């Protein structure tokens, strides 16, 4: 959508851990842009949109925040794993915006959190192949092959879930951040 034109916004560059993938993506765009390092993107842009895996969240966040820029991220798990992000953003007059995407009603949860919420429980369902390689699956020797019905593979807090399934629980992390906290959200 941004490539098609949005008033006041321009897609100017991308960063990627895999240059060949980024180059292939560039061929789909209407407007030519540059492939840059994370540092270069953060330096040249006013708003950095992060859709990268959690493993590079801290690098992207630090590069953006240290320059007092705006970071829009989908990585609730990355925010939970880097608790100093909010403090750093305040100190540098930067902003961190968690794009909540798949979680309808998050504004209602935020509003309710101004009052009293006694408990928040979230049930997440994922296809087994989406969980392959997740730390919790590997560490607990959970076999995903042959699963053909709903099976509980994890119970815990949103914070624990973010560590156990860093690529799969950004929605739960966002719910925890918006509501009663990542440690109390189940």
What is the role of each PLM region?
Residues 14, 48, 185:
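Receiver (REC) domain switch-region micro-motif
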Residues 1, 51, 55-59, 81-82, ...:
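Short glycine/serine/threonine-rich phosphate/pyrophosphate-binding segments
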Residues 10-13, 46, 94-96:
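Short active-site oxyanion
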Residues 59-62, 67, 75-95, 100:
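Rossmann-fold NAD(P)-binding glycine/threonine-rich loop
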Residues 33-66, 78-79:
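Beta-loop-alpha module in the N-terminal Rossmann-like domain of NAD(P)-dependent dehydrogenases
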Residues 102-186:
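Active-site-lining helix/loop region of Rossmann-like oxidoreductase modules
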Residues 1-28:
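N-terminal Rossmann-like dinucleotide-binding module
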């Amino acid at each position: 959508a941004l490539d098609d034109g949005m008033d006041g916004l321009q897609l100017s560059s991308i960063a990627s851990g895999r240059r060949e993938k980024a180059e292939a993506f560039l061929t789909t765009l209407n407007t030519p842009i540059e492939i840059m390092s994370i540092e270069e993107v953060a330096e040249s842009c006013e708003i950095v949109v992060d859709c990268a895996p959690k493993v590079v969240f801290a690098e992207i966040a630090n590069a953006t925040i240290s320059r007092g820029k705006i970071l829009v991220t989908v990585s609730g798990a990355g925010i939970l794993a880097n608790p100093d992000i909010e403090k750093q953003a305040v100190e540098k007059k930067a902003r961190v915006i968690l794009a909540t995407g798949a979680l309808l009603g998050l504004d209602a949860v935020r509003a309710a959190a101004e009052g009293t919420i006694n408990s928040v429980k979230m049930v997440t369902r994922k296809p087994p192949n989406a969980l392959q390689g997740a730390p919790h699956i590997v560490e607990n020797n959970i076999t995903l092959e042959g699963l053909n019905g709903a099976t509980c593979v994890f119970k815990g807090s949103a914070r624990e879930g973010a560590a156990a399934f860093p690529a799969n629980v950004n929605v739960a992390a966002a719910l925890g951040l918006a509501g009663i906290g990542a440690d109390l959200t189940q």
